[in-house]
């Protein structure tokens, strides 16, 4: 590793010297801002002005990268990039795919002079080079690039994120956006946690009523797939194909033998009577038949549903109460590592073998272990045993939205200033220790039913993604102070053609003098930090009449239950204690941020819907906060010590006006 780094520096210095000589030693452009930070940069004089043409050298694989690049370039800066052949001319962008050991499997070289050239030895490296050019392009009004040379090789080969889709359904549309966001920031691993369950204390202490879901279409066990949201096998395959185009590896996770309530709901006889129905019974042969059949469905054949090289088998948080169950857990873990490998995949596990210390051998060679808590898996001992470690320390990089424990929002300042993947809990390894593959962060949706939406998750996820991408790529070598990083990162898009936060440019407003029923506005929604104002001459509105709808939310002039001003998103109905009376003219304003949604009537604050701490003892105390949809499950708290913080945020919908009778005038939306 050290020899390779020396060679990279030698390559960089050689490139810089030749570049500087050609420009008469004029080197004035400072290192440009991108995320993650460029590892090495030598500035030159002047700016590169794009011609709108690109050349590809490297065959069909490079052509595919170039096509994605051109489409993203057009989406991001509004200018077209078209292919050409022959020698490059001033303003052309050249993509070169050729062997170069010094760049490794993901590094690239970026030469920006009269011609911009991206050189990489792998498709992945070429993709990352295009992401850098895109970020540089969007920061200049004419898409001009600062002249100079960058040699950019990541410190860690695995840079990732895990999404808990089991406790909360995350729509495929968002996962596709997430792939593009991760790629834009050179994060190359997305782990999708496909099954999990809520906490029993929120569901009357009854396992049979406790939320549980397996999110993937399943033919082997008809009826297993979640009814409140799932992915078809076809769309899951398409997600992986999209990820491959963008340099992102999908790691699907089926979590067994704990966190398995979705499976015991389907087949109760394989649930543990001793440790709880969220645990599989490790001593029941039917358990192994069931789990074998489940993995087999997605792993067998020439074109399996799980396309990637790695499959995660879970093995998280099983009881270690007795010696015999510990040994059986170790047997189970070893069995499914080898079972996954029998289909040509690398197995990944959650670290648990310190918690489950025993005599039964568990395969370690070529096994990926996610080290999340050192009490469950001592990382130095796991290194000694031969596991390949992924640094995902719970006390630093776990987001559990609005739960009151772990992080609601990561401490990005602390992570940026002090953390790298070499830090696993309180254990510090040498940087680039070969046993550490890289680092990840995670979103765990522990409190199923707490009102959190995908928009809320995104608000927590995105700044963490930008920060962790830097710390996993640039490592300890970041040179920019955090405050400057935190300010400049806001100038970058989430990804080309992606705006999940519904951010508007500064100063942008939407003004409609007379809002007509059914009118479209040209805007889908507006994100946190908005103010929506309008005047209403009230009419006799039917219950369930919207003011506005979008794909993600509805704002009601008269809600479906009581006819109040209200909003609904993702199955949660939240009502203001205010009705617009027939024949009355009032001025309404709605403001919203990441914590609350507020109603103003005639200029005065009428009601603030913020986080609501619930200690409910009866089901009726929660139902008023839930969707009127009778198929929606509703969490119940029987234990006053089990507190849930119910969230009432809203990204305001603007896509289409409802079919209302009232007269709505003076609509003004600001951000």
Question: Which residues does each PLM region occupy?
Answer:
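Hydrophobic faces of well-ordered beta-strands that scaffold small-molecule active sites
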Residues: 159-163, 190-192, 250-254, 309-313, ...
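Active-site beta-loop-alpha junctions enriched in small/polar residues
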Residues: 166, 195-199, 255-259, 316-318, ...
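Extracellular glycan-associated modules
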Residues: 503-671
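Bacterial Sec-dependent N-terminal signal peptides
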Residues: 1-30
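Feature activates predominantly on carbohydrate-active enzymes
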Residues: 102-279, 286, 292-310, 339, ...
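Flexible, acidic glycine-rich loops studded with aromatic residues
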Residues: 361-367, 374-513
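Active-site neighborhood of glycoside hydrolase catalytic domains
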Residues: 263, 268-367, 372-385
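Acidic, contiguous N-terminal accessory segments
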Residues: 6, 25-154, 347-356, 363, ...
């Amino acid at each position: 590793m050290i020899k390779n780094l020396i060679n990279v520096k030698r390559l960089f210095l050689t490139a810089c010297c030749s570049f500087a000589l050609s420009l008469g030693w004029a080197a004035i452009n400072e290192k440009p801002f991108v995320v993650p930070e460029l590892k090495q940069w030598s500035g030159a004089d002047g700016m590169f002005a794009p011609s709108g043409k690109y050349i590809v050298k490297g065959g069909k694989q490079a052509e595919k990268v170039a096509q994605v690049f051109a489409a993203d370039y057009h989406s991001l800066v509004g200018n077209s990039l078209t292919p050409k052949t022959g020698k490059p001319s001033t303003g052309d962008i050249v993509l070169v795919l050729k062997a170069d050991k010094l760049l490794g499997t993901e590094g690239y070289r970026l030469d920006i002079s009269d011609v911009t050239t991206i050189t990489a030895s792998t498709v992945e490296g070429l993709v990352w080079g295009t992401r850098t050019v895109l970020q540089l392009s969007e920061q200049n009004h004419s898409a001009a690039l600062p002249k100079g040379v960058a040699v950019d090789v990541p410190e860690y080969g695995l840079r990732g994120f895990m999404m808990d889709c089991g406790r909360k359904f995350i729509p495929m549309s968002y996962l596709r956006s997430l792939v593009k966001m991760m790629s834009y920031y050179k994060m190359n691993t997305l782990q999708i946690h496909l099954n999990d369950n809520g906490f029993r204390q929120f569901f009357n202490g009854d396992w049979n009523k406790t939320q549980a879901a397996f999110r993937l279409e399943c033919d082997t066990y008809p009826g297993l797939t979640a009814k409140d949201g799932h992915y078809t096998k076809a769309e899951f395959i398409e997600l992986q194909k999209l990820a491959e185009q963008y340099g992102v590896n999908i790691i699907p996770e089926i979590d067994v033998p704990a966190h398995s309530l979705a499976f015991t709901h389907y087949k109760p006889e394989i649930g543990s009577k001793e440790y709880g129905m969220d645990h599989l019974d490790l001593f029941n042969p039917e358990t192994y038949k069931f789990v074998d059949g489940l993995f087999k469905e997605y792993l067998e054949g020439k074109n399996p549903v799980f396309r990637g090289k790695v499959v995660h088998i879970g093995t998280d948080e099983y009881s270690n109460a007795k010696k015999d169950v510990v040994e059986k857990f170790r047997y189970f873990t070893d069995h499914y590592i080898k079972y996954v490998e029998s289909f040509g995949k690398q197995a990944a596990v959650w670290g648990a073998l310190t918690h489950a210390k025993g005599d039964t051998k568990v395969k370690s060679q070529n096994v990926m272990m996610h080290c999340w808590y050192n009490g469950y898996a001592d990382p130095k001992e796991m290194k000694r045993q031969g596991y390949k470690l992924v640094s995902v320390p719970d006390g630093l990089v776990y987001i559990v939205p609005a739960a009151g424990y772990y992080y609601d929002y990561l401490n990005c300042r602390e992570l940026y200033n002090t953390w790298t993947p070499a830090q696993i809990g309180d254990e510090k390894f040498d940087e680039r220790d070969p046993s550490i593959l890289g680092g990840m962060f995670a979103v765990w949706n522990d409190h199923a039913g707490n009102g959190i939406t995908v928009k809320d998750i995104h608000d927590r996820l995105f700044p963490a993604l930008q920060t962790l991408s830097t710390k996993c790529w640039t490592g300890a070598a970041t040179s920019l102070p955090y405050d400057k990083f935190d300010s400049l990162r806001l100038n970058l898009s989430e990804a080309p053609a992606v705006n999940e936060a519904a951010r508007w440019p500064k100063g942008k407003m939407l003004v409609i003098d007379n809002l007509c029923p059914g009118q479209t506005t040209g805007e889908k929604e507006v994100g946190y930090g908005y103010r929506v104002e309008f005047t209403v001459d009230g009419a006799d509105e039917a219950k369930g009449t919207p003011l506005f709808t979008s794909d993600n939310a509805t704002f009601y002039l008269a809600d479906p239950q009581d006819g109040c001003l209200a909003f609904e998103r993702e199955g949660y109905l939240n009502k203001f204690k205010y009705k617009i009376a027939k024949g009355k003219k009032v001025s309404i304003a709605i403001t919203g941020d990441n914590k609350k949604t507020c109603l103003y009537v005639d200029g005065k604050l009428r009601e603030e819907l913020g986080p609501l701490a619930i200690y409910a003892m009866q089901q009726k105390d929660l139902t008023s906060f839930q969707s009127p949809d009778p198929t929606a499950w509703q969490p119940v708290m029987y234990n006053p010590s089990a507190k849930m913080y119910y969230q009432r945020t809203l990204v305001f919908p603007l896509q289409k006006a409802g079919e209302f009778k009232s007269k709505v005038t003076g609509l003004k939306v600001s951000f």
